[in-house]
């Protein structure tokens, strides 16, 4: 539930830490108590909410996040989520909350997510493109699993971290790749 996603206004000071994953370098960001960002270095929208000033300090939340990532990259499903602080529109937060609920090793389409949102809001339909924009701007990769979102027909559409990483993450989770395919022309939302 939304209780898992804490919206806390941290101080203005931001902190970063680095993590080396089998898929490349990852940067973690925090407001001092909660995780505010997790990006593959060089990915689209990298550090979108990072201020110019930050300190490289090994905070408790970074230790916890790295423990989560160690378990994850060892093919295990972590049974906890570090404290997250997300600042975004209500719409984006609602989309990211649905992402948190996609089970490990499974996928949902943009259409599935828009149907869930429409139902939540009592609407007939909801734009899958708007959902795509929210998914693409997810600031906490892997933990908020935007890599589990696919196109309506199993098309492995864009992933801010790159399609190779998306495929590698899904394979790591043992997802059924049989019904999924890579678009001829890679598109990232």
Task: Name each region found by the language model.
Residues 9, 32-33, 43, 173-175:
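Short loop segments at secondary-structure junctions
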Residues 30-81:
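Compact structured core domains
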Residues 1-6:
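Short, small-residue-biased leader/transition segments that mark boundaries at the very start
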Residues 15-25, 67, 76-189:
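Nucleic acid-binding interface residues in structured DNA/RNA-binding domains
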Residues 10-36:
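DNA-contacting interfaces and partner/effector-binding or oligomerization modules
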Residues 9-10, 186:
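Short hotspots in intrinsically disordered terminal tails
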